[in-house]
Each structure stands twice: as structure tokens, then as C-alpha cells.
């Protein structure tokens, strides 16, 4: 396989500096679109403290998936796109599982669900506990994963 054609792209320069550039690969990239599930709130058994094991807490989950547009387009066919319903059902099942200690663990599981469809190239998961600190709307994490080429 031959190396991709590379052309230099000039960078912004500071006053008095010499121009610099670096090669940028010129490769064809598939057309993509985004699927977003925003602010899905579910009760979960989550937390590291003993008092958190006896009750459920509200957790807000948001997911963004960058999806490869199929060759020839979608054609208004549900079989040519990832299932939104499958994602929501997977999140509900995740919320009903046994106690989880960390929101980071939940975010990893959310990414596993999102990346399960082969058309998904990249996924972002945001997981927030809503009722932890009285002076904050939430505390949370944001994880991102890309499919390896």
C-alpha cells in the first residue's frame, strides 16, 4: 500500500518567526452524520459510599454517535441506521443492573453500547449524577471512543 499524498499546510506564525508547515494526509473520508440522545434520566444504584448502596440516584446520560452514512444513502430504510430504540433499551438495562460504584464505569458501558453497531465510527458518553452536591446541577464525566482503522 502506498503512502498517502501529503501536501504542506502553513501554520499561523508569530511575529518575527520563520514560516513552518507540516504534511497533512489527503485521504477520502466517508460521509458521516450524528445521532444524539440527550439528557436520558434514569434511577441507578450507584456510588462508592455505604449509604449509596441502599437507594437509587438520578443519573443523566447523553450519547453522541458519529455514524458512517451508508453508500447510496439511507433511503428511508430503518435497517440502514443504528437502532435508537436499541440504544435506549440498552441504557435502561444498564440502569437496572447491580450496584455500580463509579460513573466512569457507567460511561465505559455506555460507550460499549454505542460502539456495538458497525456503522458507528465515534461515540461520546456523558454520565452525570444529579443529586450529589446541593450547589451544583450535577457532577459527571465525558468519555470518547473512536473505532480503530
Model regions: which residues?
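N-terminal, polar/charged subdomain of small-to-medium soluble alpha/beta proteins
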Residues: 2-149
Amino acid at each position: 500500500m502506498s503512502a498517502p499524498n501529503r501536501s504542506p499546510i502553513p501554520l499561523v506564525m508569530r511575529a518575527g518567526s520563520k514560516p513552518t508547515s507540516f504534511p497533512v494526509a489527503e485521504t477520502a473520508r466517508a460521509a458521516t452524520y450524528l445521532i444524539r440522545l440527550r439528557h436520558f434520566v434514569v434511577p441507578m444504584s450507584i456510588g462508592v459510599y455505604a449509604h449509596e448502596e441502599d437507594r437509587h440516584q438520578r443519573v443523566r446520560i447523553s450519547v453522541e454517535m458519529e455514524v458512517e452514512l451508508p453508500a447510496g444513502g439511507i433511503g428511508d430504510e430503518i435497517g440502514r441506521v443504528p437502532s435508537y430504540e436499541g440504544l435506549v433499551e440498552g441504557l435502561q438495562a444498564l440502569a437496572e443492573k447491580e450496584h455500580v460504584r463509579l460513573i466512569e464505569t457507567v460511561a465505559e458501558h455506555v460507550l460499549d453500547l454505542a460502539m456495538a453497531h458497525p456503522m458507528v465510527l465515534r461515540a461520546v458518553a456523558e454520565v452525570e449524577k444529579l443529586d450529589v452536591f446541593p450547589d451544583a446541577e450535577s457532577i459527571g464525566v465525558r468519555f470518547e471512543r473512536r473505532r480503530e482503522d
